[in-house]
Amino acid sequence: MPSIPVTLPSKPEASHAREVAFIGGIISTPLRLRLLSTVGKVDNRDEIRDFLASRRARISPQQAGLAPGGRRRVPGLRREEVAVLAGVSTDWYTRLEKGHITGVSEDVLNAVARALQLDDAERAHLFDLARAATTGPSPRRVRKVRPGLQRMLDAMTDAPAIIRNGRMDIVAANRLGQAMYWPVYQSRVPAPGRGPRPDTARPQPANIARFQFLDPAGHDFFPDWENAADITVALLRTEAGRDPYNKELTQLIGELSTRSDDFRGRWAQHNVRLHHTGTKAYHHPAIGDLVLDYESMDLHADPGLNLTVYTAAPDTPSHDALRLLASWAATLAQPDQPHDADAQHA
């Protein structure tokens, strides 16, 4: 897919202003500042404002147990109604929605979460935003995927398994996982403003999000592309709330927002989610259709990494397809996995 280079003005001041105007409302303030290379204190007020406003807009008075009242200019609850439901003053909630979240107690955050009917993922995201408002960036360490993790993956011989980081980089996989995600490993999406990556270049991490939004093959690999894309963006949004100072993550979000209308629209919705179990459909170029159950878990001994294992119910076409995938995997050379560059999670 051809790249879409971003032409920047020659003056840094003009560049800054135009980029903010372009990205404003799509990427939160911390991410915007990082993308613009303005090093300094990061303010996440815009992110808090947009998240709370988006959650407030989706709840009708009837859903909240309130009388509908008169005509409304915008959908959803009014700020004063959220304040009543949360048991705080209107002025106080208004300040909170404007991003003044520093020092807010857990009890108050929980009350707001209940008033806005946040699910578990959204509640965790709100607390992540509050935490980011009171803490600064911590030193980041580059870690290799531990040998024990790779041995664990390799011991799983009948099920595809991958380990990814918060950027959606596949940082480790077993043989079946490599075979299943072969199209992602083989993707040659060019970097912004550059041509395709030559085969002699240093291997880059296999990134599910870049493949999904920037490589046309992503639409073939994910038959239910719309739903899969929703999940990917929600996972990235969740990770951005957890780690708003992660330069690699914010660069990825900036790239996808600039180059993909599909990503940009989804990012503006502020949806978040926890990704632990479910069923996904795939169309593998060598094997055909697969419908696989997955179990996903965060690796608490390795913060920032997530293990996902895929299985198929016995006596199903997908179970037979996994056997065929294993036979096909045996014919492949293993793709490069630059672990030392990709497992950044501290």
List each language-model region with its residue ranges.
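An N-terminal domain-cap segment
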Residues: 63-77, 135-148, 154-157
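Hydrophobic protein-protein interaction segments
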Residues: 147-167, 171-346
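Recognition helix of helix-turn-helix/homeodomain-like DNA-binding domains
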Residues: 70-73, 79-80, 86-103, 113
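Low-acidity, Ser/Thr- and Arg-rich intrinsically disordered low-complexity segments
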Residues: 2-18, 28
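Short amphipathic recognition helices of helix-turn-helix/homeodomain-type DNA-binding modules
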Residues: 27-53, 104-151
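Short basic helix-loop element that most often maps to the first helix and adjoining turn
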Residues: 46, 50-85
